[in-house]
Amino acid sequence: MNNALLDARLQQALGYTFSRSGLLQQALTHRSYGALNNERLEFLGDSVLNCSVARALYDAFPDLPEGSLSRLRANLVRQETLAEIAGALRLGDSLRLGEGELKSGGFRRPSILADALESLFGAVFLDAGFDEAQRVVRRLFDPLVAQIDPKASGKDPKTRLQEILQSRRLPLPEYRLVGTEGEAHDQSFIVECLLAKPVLSTRGTGKSRRAAEQEAARQACAELQR
């Protein structure tokens, strides 16, 4: 697939079409590829991301104190989460990487994927302003925010499940990707959460693998707390 088609697919998955295609190209260009790379856009996008996620949490959990909100935000914007969202968008297929990074599999490296996603947020901000950039961020992160149970000290379902099992001295869960649904630009991931003791299997569906894992963990928590 040529670059134009890959870029079109990425924009469709992102839910935003760039007016200035040069910004998209820059956001997708790693420093190993050329001088006009995405590092400055990443700097902008990091701020857009943090502000947008902070607002999402502020609106969703009016009773949570600042400390809990900060912990939740840190969990949502960490590299692992960003890389999984980037993977769901198939962002790696569109990256411009130098020959060395290509050979070493840089298009799969979590740090490169996470940085590129932040660069995209920065590029949308420059292309259309903060409101549109925030909309793009919220479209990707609101499903993760919706899975958080505020009654569980603001902890996400995977963390809660791990703590429940550890408190009972039971083995930790295993998460397996069962499959995907939908078109390439709008895929949903299906993940199974397996507990060895007590024997339990739950399934979750989400727009990213992480979101699906969280949903499967949420169901497992509910079963264990019955």
UniProtKB/Swiss-Prot annotation:
Keywords attached to this entry: Cytoplasm, Endonuclease, Hydrolase, Magnesium, Metal-binding, mRNA processing, Nuclease, RNA-binding, rRNA processing, rRNA-binding, tRNA processing
According to UniProt, the name of this protein is Ribonuclease 3
Q: EC number(s) in its UniProt entry?
A: 3.1.26.3
Q: Where is the RNase III domain?
A: 7-129
Localization, per the record, is: Cytoplasm
Q: How does it assemble?
A: Homodimer.
Which co-factors does it depend on?
Answer: Mg(2+)
Alphabetized InterPro entries for the sequence: dsRBD_dom, RNase_III, RNase_III_dom, RNase_III_sf
Q: Which GO terms describe its biological process?
A: mRNA processing; regulation of gene expression; rRNA processing; tRNA processing
Provide the residue positions that the database annotates as binding Mg(2+): 42, 115, 118
PROSITE patterns named in the record? DS_RBD (PS50137), RNASE_3_1 (PS00517), RNASE_3_2 (PS50142)
Q: Which residues form the active site?
A: 46, 118
Q: Which domain of life is it from?
A: Bacteria
Domain DRBM stretches: 156-226
Which chemical reaction does it catalyze? Answer: Endonucleolytic cleavage to 5'-phosphomonoester
Q: Which gene encodes it?
A: rnc
Summarizing the function annotation, the protein's role is: Digests double-stranded RNA. Involved in the processing of primary rRNA transcript to yield the immediate precursors to the large and small rRNAs (23S and 16S). Processes some mRNAs, and tRNAs when they are encoded in the rRNA operon. Processes pre-crRNA and tracrRNA of type II CRISPR loci if present in the organism.
Annotated PANTHER family? RIBONUCLEASE 3, RIBONUCLEASE III
Cellular component terms per the entry's GO annotation: cytoplasm
Originating species: Thiobacillus denitrificans (strain ATCC 25259 / T1)
Tell me if Acyltransferase is a UniProt keyword of this record: no
- Family, as annotated: Belongs to the ribonuclease III family.
The entry lists its GO molecular-function terms as: double-stranded RNA binding; metal ion binding; ribonuclease III activity; rRNA binding
